[in-house]
Amino acid sequence: MEPFSKKSYQRKVEAIFTRFPSVQKVPFKDAYKPGLENMLKFEGVLGNPHKSLRTIHVAGTNGKGSVANMLASALSACGLRVGLYTSPHIVDFRERMRIVGEKQSAELVSEEYVYDFLCRYEADM
């Protein structure tokens, strides 16, 4: 595995956008893949984390980001550790993934963590 650097991180993120156009902005018809086969396979690779985590999925036409952020803040204020994933990002891919801390301040997931994850699961994606 190539050691972490800003350049190696950026190459990994760009590779994900190239390999999976639905992660980035593409016409819907090009990004949509019917069926759950790929998602079920990837869940297995990750060890089916959805079976051990309590989650809230916010869906709908408008206001998902606002509702998700309000829920994250409220749950954090109640003393729970909260992770939040939203899409799309504005500048940095890591904006999509946040851990809402006790002080309700969202911190970006480190580039090193994302890079390690992408390297570890690259062959399975």
Please give the residue ranges for each predicted region:
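Short active-site-proximal "capping" loops at secondary-structure junctions
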Residues: G63-K64, I90
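N-terminal phosphate/diphosphate-binding loop that engages ATP/GTP or pyrophosphate donors
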Residues: N69-D124
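Short, basic, glycine/proline-bearing loop/turn elements
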Residues: I56-H57, A123-M125
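Short functional linear segments
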Residues: M1-G60, S66-N69, S73-C78, Y85
